């Protein structure tokens, strides 16, 4: 009888441990757990190795999984991306340009980003992408071609004849010195061919990520307001309260969707 009771206790303990590891069939796992090829949540190689569907997947050797299987791919799901771009009108040029796959491909060319990004950072980034492009409607700045973004005093990245350096891509890369520095970093001739940003969606997202890593990520720990200032400081201090409030609304929305707290210091 005592042996039977002991067996029952051990069995119940096993069930408790099992339920702690396997949260639900077909996944919906916590952020730190992998969804296995069979649709269960866990953290061992059986879950995070071969066939891993989402979460912090890794190859059988213990390294991060290929594009789409790592943390950035598990956060920026197709459903999350579609929830944004589907709000753009049917006639928007960006609707047939920007894709979730092009973002993931671009992100994986920045391993320091792809392997360390958090849900709050994605909420921050896509709030700005949404605002800058109108839910991925616009590839280029409205009336941008009529505006002069050539700093003739910048001799390191001189303007090419007949080329315009107006806003393009998800972060609206602007000015010759930004096109020049970005192109140099990405090994692309963006100074001579700025139109590459508006003709190749992966290049477009790569330019956004370049600007992000150099100008925005360093201030993330200061709050969302600091990222607004990094992208368009003219909106701050009452410069354009409507734009600031719109960015904050998007940010709060995406934090809610991704299950993270927005944190303090949202405005600038």
Swiss-Prot record:
This is Basic endochitinase CHB4. The keyword rRNA-binding does not apply. Induction: By infection with the fungal pathogen Phoma lingam. GO terms for cellular component: extracellular region. It comes from Brassica napus. It is found in: Secreted, Extracellular space. The keyword Ribosomal protein does not apply. It catalyses: Random endo-hydrolysis of N-acetyl-beta-D-glucosaminide (1->4)-beta-linkages in chitin and chitodextrins. One of its GO terms (biological process) is polysaccharide catabolic process. Keywords: Carbohydrate metabolism, Chitin degradation, Chitin-binding, Disulfide bond, Glycoprotein, Glycosidase, Hydrolase, Plant defense, Polysaccharide degradation, Secreted, Signal. Pfam families: Chitin_bind_1, Glyco_hydro_19. Disulfide bonds join 27-35, 29-41, 34-48, 52-57, 92-137, 150-159, 236-268. Residues 1-24 form the signal peptide.
